[in-house]
């Protein structure tokens, strides 16, 4: 990352989201080796002429957050500069296929998405992102094969939040509430404020297991981390009845 910055190319990295956004892209503008910090552009909370501001993240915190999504980085720059970095061709192609597969998924081209991700895994069997995305596509079809792909993703990257969340969602759909709770909990242990709706899901599976106090706490956290949730009123009424 620092090598790229030193070459004058501001990399775009994939980082965890907040509230009801599970992921976001951020431009890294620099670093400070003395202070051990990373500089990145973040959107202004209030409209302004520039619309962006520079944020500072402690280096260790940044590394932890970046690792949750496989340390993905997008580089935009002159071909001669990019090629001088001498990236692993198979890894680069594998990561590119991951981005292309997400586009195919949005276009509802499921078969093409699966083929693209399988090719990504063939090119780089250690690509935790490709394995997790493939698990996600199969999960949408309620295909139990998704479990093995999520588990392989976690073997490659123990901090893969989305793999644990995906397992939690799969087991919830199949009413295996104890397994669902376990995986949601693992995700929350990795990052407790990345995605507010995960608390609603864990609250539901705990409620189904008659863990009412824990369920209530999860619903409260859902409102805390997702204050603008469309179903906030319904959740608050449910809390009053619990």
Task: Describe each region flagged by the PLM.
Residues 94, 128-129, 161-162, 195-197, ...:
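Helix-start (N-cap) detector for alpha-helical repeat units in TPR-like alpha-solenoids
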Residues 31-129:
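Noncatalytic regulatory segments and standalone regulatory/sensor domains
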Residues 1-40:
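Active-site-adjacent substructure of cysteine-protease-like catalytic cores
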Residues 133, 166, 200-201, 234-238:
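Canonical tetratricopeptide repeat
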């Amino acid at each position: 990352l620092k090598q790229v910055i030193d070459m004058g190319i501001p990399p775009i990295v994939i980082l965890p989201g907040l509230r009801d956004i599970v992921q976001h892209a951020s431009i890294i503008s620099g670093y400070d080796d003395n202070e051990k910090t990373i500089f990145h552009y973040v959107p202004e909370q209030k409209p302004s002429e520039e619309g962006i501001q520079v944020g500072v993240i402690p280096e260790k915190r940044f590394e932890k957050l970046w690792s949750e999504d496989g340390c993905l980085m997008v580089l935009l720059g002159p071909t001669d500069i990019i090629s001088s970095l001498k990236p692993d061709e198979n890894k680069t192609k594998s990561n590119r296929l991951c981005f292309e597969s997400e586009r195919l998924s949005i276009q509802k081209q499921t078969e093409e998405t699966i083929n693209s991700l399988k090719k990504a895994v063939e090119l780089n069997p250690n690509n935790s992102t490709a394995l997790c995305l493939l698990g996600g596509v199969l999960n949408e079809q309620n295909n139990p094969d998704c479990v093995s792909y999520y588990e392989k993703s976690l073997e490659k990257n123990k901090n893969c939040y989305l793999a644990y969340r995906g397992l939690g969602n799969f087991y919830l759909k199949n009413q295996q509430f104890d397994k669902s709770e376990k995986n949601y909990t693992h995700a929350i242990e990795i990052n407790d404020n990345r995605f507010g709706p995960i608390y609603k899901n864990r609250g539901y599976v705990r409620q189904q297991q008659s863990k009412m106090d824990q369920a209530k706490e999860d619903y409260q956290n859902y409102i805390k981390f997702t204050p603008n949730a469309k179903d906030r009123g319904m959740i608050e009424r449910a809390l009053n009845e619990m």
